Amino acid sequence: MIFLKEPAMRRQYLLPLLVILMFLLSLLQADNSPAKGLDGRQQSMVLVSAYTANGDLERLRPALIQALDAGLSINEIKEVLTHLYAYIGFPRSLNGLQVFMEVLEQRRARGITDTEGKAASPLPPSLDRDAYGARVRADLAGQKEIQPPSGVLAFAPVIDTFLKEHLFADIFARDVLDRKARELCTIAALASLPGLGGQLQFHMGGAMNCGLSPEELESFLDLLAARVGTQEADAARTVARKVLASH
């Protein structure tokens, strides 16, 4: 009788052990899987960009502190604020930099040392800025071939030149931020201002063409709703539906 009971007893103890083992394996897989939403650094970039764009300097100040605490370097945050001037103008970009300077001074006075971070590498003197910028713009648009100017770019050729040679070359070629980060900052700024649906759609598509996932885009929209405004988030969701339908 003892020999008859042993297999049954083994099964009795093995089954709970197997259940526990499967549970532990599922936890390990969850821990090793990449996060689907925006990480802390990305969330900080979104908030800094949004508050700089809409001029909410009171909320910008804690957002800058959050960005530093999330691990962004001084130079990365400077780059975010400088990058934005091409979309929101010098005045608001300069306001953002002024607030950031004050935040750093206050932190230094309290004995907090923030990481300076990498500075931008010099651009090669031989860089063909027109060709480089045209290629960057085509990449953001998801186009293999560079298209000739049309519409407003053909109507005012000089702005096409400025876009290619300055925005998409002088600015985008700076290696402090990658293209995905730049596009994330751009859509945060554009989504925080009214009447920019067309530009937001282009750059939201550009962000996805630079590697922003649908889950990260959803996280961006949720953050916009929670920390910037439901009206801005609702308008951005309308644009996002169009972008997701084509990606």
PLM feature segments, named:
Residues L4, L28-Q42, A53-A70, E76, ...:
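Acidic, glycine/proline-rich low-complexity segments that act as flexible tails and inter-domain linkers
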Residues P7-L17:
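Bacterial N-terminal signal peptides that target proteins for export
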Residues P16-S26:
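Bacterial N-terminal signal peptides
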Residues A50, A189-P194:
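Extracellular/lumenal glycan-associated surfaces
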